[in-house]
C-alpha cells in the first residue's frame, strides 16, 4: 500500500467519459485530463514553523476535485494513482 508523506494525498483517478452525450466515442488524445478522484491514503499532515503538525482536511474515501495539472502520476501494482499536495485539492464532492 502507498503511504504518502507530510501533506500529500494518494488518489485513484475517476476515469474520463469514453463518449460524448451524443454517443461519439472519444479517442484517448481527445479526452480531458481527469480532475476528479477518490482519496486512497493521506499523509500525516503539514508541519508548521513552530513544529506543530496540522492534520489534513481530507480523509480516505473522499471524492475530490483537484487542479488540472497537479500531482505526480504513479503506477503501483498495476493501478494508476496520482500523488498530490493537499493545497492542489480544490473541493470535496458531497
UniProtKB/Swiss-Prot annotation:
Disulfide bonds: none
PROSITE patterns registered for this protein in UniProt: CHAPERONINS_CPN10
Top-level taxonomic group: Bacteria
Compartments, record wording: Cytoplasm
Family matches, as InterPro entries: Chaperonin_GroES, Chaperonin_GroES_sf, Chaprnonin_Cpn10_CS, GroES-like_sf
A biological process term (GO) from this entry: chaperone cofactor-dependent protein refolding
GO molecular function: ATP binding; metal ion binding; protein folding chaperone; protein-folding chaperone binding; unfolded protein binding
Alphabetically ordered keywords of this record: Chaperone, Cytoplasm, Stress response
One Pfam family it belongs to: Cpn10
Alphabetized SUPFAM superfamilies for the sequence: GroES-like
One of the record's GO cellular component terms: cytoplasm
Assembly and oligomerization: Heptamer of 7 subunits arranged in a ring. Interacts with the chaperonin GroEL.
Function according to Swiss-Prot or TrEMBL: Together with the chaperonin GroEL, plays an essential role in assisting protein folding. The GroEL-GroES system forms a nano-cage that allows encapsulation of the non-native substrate proteins and provides a physical environment optimized to promote and accelerate protein folding. GroES binds to the apical surface of the GroEL ring, thereby capping the opening of the GroEL channel.
Family: Belongs to the GroES chaperonin family.
Protein name: Co-chaperonin GroES
Gene from which this protein is expressed: groES
